[in-house]
Amino acid sequence: MVDLSIEIAGIKMKNPIMNAACPISRDAETMKLLIDNGVGGVVAKTISVKPAIVPRPSMAVVDRGMGRFYYLKTLKPGDVRITPVDAGNHRFIHAFLNAELWSDIPAEHYLEREYPNVKNYCRERGVAFFVSIGYKPEELALLGPKVEKAGADAIEFSTHYIGKDYRPVVEAAKALRESVSIPIFAKLSPFTPNIPDLVKDLEKVRVDGIVATNTIGPALNIDVETGMPIVGGPYGYGWMSGPALKPISLAVVAEAARSTKLPIIGVGGITRGVDVIEYFMAGASAVQICTAALVEGFSVFQRILNETVTWLEKHGYSSILDVKGLALKYLKPEPRRVWAKPPLVDEKKCIGCGFCQQVCDYDAVHVEESGGGKRLAVVDRTKCYGCGLCTSVCPTRAIHFEE
């Protein structure tokens, strides 16, 4: 039996999967649905001193979810080929835009009605209750004590998106820390500058954890049939989330993990159990999910939980903590190598689909029939540049680097 339980900043959770602060946690009823669908911690949608004026439309899938992908088609026994298709299936959505801002409901409504309601539900079911607030130091100092009194286990705080100066984050953290006694978590932007120095300064003001990252932007997507932007923010801009954000957020998580012992909650582009594993390997102690739930529904949390357990069992791990930080030892400041190293082909795994041949820009990989009639990938070592693209698309990991 795999153990998914964690503890962050003294808060015990039955599993590390949480929702991110967004419309799926806009009130007590939606937060109860999140709890019923298996989250280990629930995060209430961000509030501030004044209700937001939210542009409409406020959310949209980029390119209507159309993504070019490939499936394996068996033409005859031993003859498997890659076949391109276009699909609007939610599993292939690559990006999502929002112009949501924070909640357009007054903070007093949450403090008086929503938080007490969901707090009791959390206590009954052993789920941690986080509240997200923003944005300026004086606003956090005002809201923080009220949120603590309303029963939050911890506070996640955001600042408005920063440029080259991270001091607003530290100033906000200091103001909140001086006003509450419960754990506080600083939510970082994808392009937060100088993360090592920032997390050290956050440690000095006694922040209890990091959340990485927020959405990225401004971003624009245009409906070519109408010429209009897909969301209704100023200039048509929104903020991007979804799978396209994951590599950026992972980099922030890893850089923070190399710089601090504070727990880090990874956010951005999680749609599968392996994404949870990836964030943990980068140093995360928990994860948050929003976009996948907006598109797939609340059941996504249980699916991702199940996939996480299955992966851990298959790979012989007994706890989610066993994989935490495993990738950090490979994240070195120098390049892995600067010379061509051709990949190897495991003939037992190769199914001859031809994906490696299709993506090779150096004409170095070809699928050929072997003596027994089986189609196999063959690497021409004299042409191979060692770029690695073929290894990243192989569905069976047959073509690989021997490190």
Where are these regions (language model features)?
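Iron-sulfur cluster-binding cysteine motifs and their immediate structural context
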Residues: F355-G372, V378, L389-E403
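Glycine-rich beta-to-alpha transition loops that act as phosphate-gripper elements at the mouths
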Residues: C22-I24, S132-P137, L188-N194, L262-V274
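Glycine/Thr-rich beta-alpha phosphate-binding loop at enzyme active sites
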Residues: A95-L101, I105, F157-P168, L198-L262, ...
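Active-site-adjacent beta->alpha loops and helix N-cap segments on the catalytic face
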Residues: E29, I53-S58, A107-N117, Y121, ...
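C-terminal helical cap(s) of enzyme catalytic domains, especially alpha/beta-barrels
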Residues: P51-D79, N221-G238, A292-Y317
